[in-house]
């Protein structure tokens, strides 16, 4: 989250990204989106999880300001996302797997001194830190709080295909290379089957990968209008030991 003193640096980052030929910039701040627009939009703008996209009206504002893709906030259901995509006329990115972003700050919770002087930065955020209270768990990464359970829509990919969604995200930030590789491979195969339009059933290797990389269990987030930590499904329900 840029502050006033960061704005000149934001402009330089946009220039550097354009020179490097990146596919897009993920933006979580309308001020940064304006900087990109004032520079002529040299790089496509994708609005991220902290941009407060809850309705098609908000998505429309960001579209008019230059965004070509939006990621609705975690609390937005799949039904609401479909309306948002249709009414705003903008690409919608759907989180299908991984930790759910729940909060962000520009100050690191894990450090005891300012970033520029704390010797633990940036190594400390590469470690795993959990916030626990009885039955619930959250993961802190310093400047953000993530869900403890992994979002998992493996069982529901045919619905996503039928609803017209085409942009999918696996949240692999702060995860291991094995997590990104194995979960990514499972979804690549599963999405291919789902979009083929035939019979869809989870392969053991897909569900095994989901279980193996979710030590705190699985959930569907708010996709179906339920509590965020709930899992709706039949095959992977057993991943949540306390349920």
Predicted regions and their residues:
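Conserved nucleotide-cofactor-binding alpha/beta core module
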Residues: 56-57
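A cross-taxonomic marker for long C-terminal extensions/tails that follow the last structured domain
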Residues: 66-67
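Active-site pocket-lining/capping segments in soluble small-molecule metabolic enzymes
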Residues: 1-53, 71-243
